[in-house]
């Protein structure tokens, strides 16, 4: 009771669910230009804030903050606040401001980096992820894990995907190339969209989000509409991306 969890919003929809599960108070800080506003997030953190989420790239907006900004943020929050750096889409990042975050771990024992095999590795149905952090923190996470949560099939698939890393990188490169093409086409068409760094693009249409999502679905293109906020569109094959652009 009295513990708080801080995040910028909108972001990954599971964060509020996790917060409610542990009966903590949720602190939401608005995004700035569709991007995590780390100075404002740091200002919202107090002695009762036990955890802060930083999603990089952010889901659903696809934007990133640079590693230098993350270092500054880590230096401005109390050491008693665990910072979870969610890098679910890290393989798709091409922004040179973002460097290897694991190099921050030795100097920041309150930092935990989470990654997944659900996105670039394509194993979403198997629910395989991992965390990197200080041994003491990882040990506490281990004690809360459900036994046998990652079954043998999922483990074998994850190992096979690691062994086939070159194939994964080729798929990611193809997605990034299509992301660049689709982004250019949208901007040529007058859309003002943030620079995407995930495997999707974000249409910040706010009040028209639900209507746009429904309209696209009627035209055979399924997207993820966030009512009152925007529409997230996954980068698919060239043909499907062209169908989306034509439907838009």
Language-model-detected regions and their locations in the chain:
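Conserved PLP-binding catalytic core of the aspartate aminotransferase-like
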Residues: 31, 175-176, 180, 184-219, ...
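PLP-dependent aminotransferase-like
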Residues: 1-54
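Active-site pre-lysine segment of PLP-dependent enzymes
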Residues: 20, 38-47, 60-83, 87-120
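PLP-dependent aminotransferase class I/II
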Residues: 110-187, 191-194
